[in-house]
Amino acid sequence: ENMTFGTTLVTNPKGGFLACGPLYAYKCGRLHYTTGVCSNVSSTFETVKAVAPSVQECKTQLDIVIVLDGSNSIYPWESVTAFLNSLLRNMDIGPQQTQVGIVQYGQTVVHEFYLNTYSTTEEVMDAALRIRQRGGTQTMTALGIDTAREEAFTEAHGARRGVQKVMVIVTDGESHDNYRLQEVIDKCEDENIQRFAIAILGSYSRGNLSTEKFVEEIKSIASKPTEKHFFNVSDELALVTIVEALGERIFALEATTDQQAASFEMEMSQAGFSAHYSQDWVMLG
């Protein structure tokens, strides 16, 4: 009843036909999927059997820690909070869903809040908007990453067994403790922490400096494949332009069953838009 979009009719080789149509859509991450129903109809127009595939589970459990460079060279800070706001609003945050914590570093490291501090998207967004830049004349990126690994991803602070750990590192300069970076990244690899690294080129552009060494360092922080885990933006204002791509790549980590999958779009099935009959089986889509 009331099916006006996507209705499919397919002839049954044994007589009669199959009629399909979508029922309703449900959201999983940033994407929407439609379930539907198909009915076998006899040559005398009697319904023989109805088939309605069950809705697949939408997996959105991730433990995400955002590691923010808050040193003096980040400017304006409002662009960082705008980036956080845009990224967080598209996450389904909760104790049984995605959890988010934020660490800020410069010369020292501060936990702004832990994975289990807040339990709704609104609470996390409000807390992120209240974060103030702590400053510092040095950029201790290795220290920031290692502190997040050691302290933020603990069960006491909300990390869950069996849930994918994700770290998002945002920085605008080469680290002053880069001699420790490889050791710290190796530890993250050992603990299966997926890392997305974002290089902000603003301070280099303002100072007319080469970005080559900086970009190479941030690429070394990102998980493999690098092209899926590394981003660079021209300045702080441009951070919001990568939110959609970053969000989709983060969500794909849990939503895809294949660890090497690059996209979530083909992972969830739909029914009601198409059908194909063979002698012994029916394919729905």
UniProtKB/Swiss-Prot annotation:
S-S pairs: none
Residues bearing attached sugar chains per UniProt: N2, N40, N208, N232
Gene3D superfamilies for the chain: von Willebrand factor, type A domain (3.40.50.410)
Domain VWFA residue range list: 66-279
GO molecular function, one term: phosphatase activator activity
InterPro entries: ECM_Assembly_Org, VWF_A, vWFA_dom_sf
SUPFAM superfamilies, A to Z: vWA-like
Main location: membrane
RNA-binding among keywords: no
Record's bilayer topology term: Single-pass type I membrane protein
Compartments it resides in: Membrane
Keywords: Cell adhesion, Glycoprotein, Integrin, Membrane, Receptor, Transmembrane
Extracellular topological domain: 1-285
GO cellular component, one term: membrane
GO biological process: cell adhesion; extracellular matrix organization; integrin-mediated signaling pathway; negative regulation of cell population proliferation; negative regulation of epidermal growth factor receptor signaling pathway
Similarity comment: family membership: Belongs to the integrin alpha chain family.
Domain notes: The integrin I-domain (insert) is a VWFA domain. Integrins with I-domains do not undergo protease cleavage.
Subunit structure: Heterodimer of an alpha and a beta subunit. Alpha-1 associates with beta-1.
Function text: Integrin alpha-1/beta-1 is a receptor for laminin and collagen. It recognizes the proline-hydroxylated sequence G-F-P-G-E-R in collagen. Involved in anchorage-dependent, negative regulation of EGF-stimulated cell growth.
Record protein name field: Integrin alpha-1
Organism: Gallus gallus
Lineage, uppermost ranks: Eukaryota, Metazoa, Chordata, Craniata, Vertebrata
